[in-house]
């Protein structure tokens, strides 16, 4: 999941560099959502293993 977040972040950077603001914003939002979801799942997995 971190891999997909990084891929979308790179797409956002490339799109913003090339002037595609809408695509860059959408890709950045997807990257942010995937990163937040991955961190939440990591924390849940970490806590469940400790119990």
Curated annotation (Swiss-Prot):
**Chief place of localization:** membrane
Cellular localisation: Cell membrane
Q: Where is the signal peptide?
A: none
State if Membrane is listed as a keyword: yes
Question: Transmembrane residues, as ranges?
Answer: 6-26, 28-47
What is the recorded membrane topology of this protein?
Multi-pass membrane protein
List where this protein forms a coiled coil.
Answer: none
Q: Does the keyword Transmembrane apply?
A: yes
Q: Which domain of life is it from?
A: Bacteria
Q: Which UniProt keywords apply?
A: Cell membrane, Membrane, Transmembrane, Transmembrane helix
One Gene Ontology cellular component annotation? Answer: plasma membrane
What family, per the record? Belongs to the UPF0391 family.
NCBIfam families associated with the record: PRK13682.1-2
Name recorded for this polypeptide: UPF0391 membrane protein Pcryo_0139
Q: What is the source species? A: Psychrobacter cryohalolentis (strain ATCC BAA-1226 / DSM 17306 / VKM B-2378 / K5)
The beginning of the lineage is: Bacteria, Pseudomonadati, Pseudomonadota, Gammaproteobacteria, Moraxellales
